[in-house]
């Protein structure tokens, strides 16, 4: 279930999280995008995926609701070497990660209660025109640019 994020919360989160994510990645970030509140119900799983590379390069998942008396719902990151690392992600914590580069998931079904999270993503300043941006990122960015041009010209 997706719920709208109250504007006052959105206005607080960007300036609060951006410096923390700047420090995490060791770079200056831009274009913060917020998504939330996403509510997961018992039995939910999050399949392994990477986020869109044009917007979610450096991200944080903020756990805003999970009863601490219930079992953890592990968050799994899979490194480039294929090895998985699991994290307990407790209420009130922000989990920072490279969302467009690392596969991430919640492979076990959610047991008991609900889990609610807000997600925020940023791109490095100058991205995707920096050496670390891969071909997939440049391709997606190019396609999106063409779509925007088509919309402005009334072709789409």
Task: Please identify what each model-predicted range represents.
Residues 40-102, 114-117, 123-138:
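Catalytic core of non-heme Fe(II) oxygenases with the double-stranded beta-helix
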Residues 1-3, 34-37:
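Short secondary-structure junction/hinge motifs that connect adjacent elements
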Residues 134-156:
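Acidic/histidine-enriched, glycine/proline-rich intrinsically disordered or flexible terminal extensions
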Residues 14-18, 57, 113:
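A structural signal for well-ordered alpha-helical scaffolds and beta->alpha junctions
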Residues 1-25:
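Non-heme Fe(II)/2-oxoglutarate
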Residues 106-112:
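Short proline/glycine-enriched turn/loop segments at secondary-structure junctions
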Residues 26-36:
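A short coil-to-beta-strand element that immediately follows conserved catalytic motifs
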Residues 11-15, 31, 50-54:
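Alpha-helix initiation and capping sites
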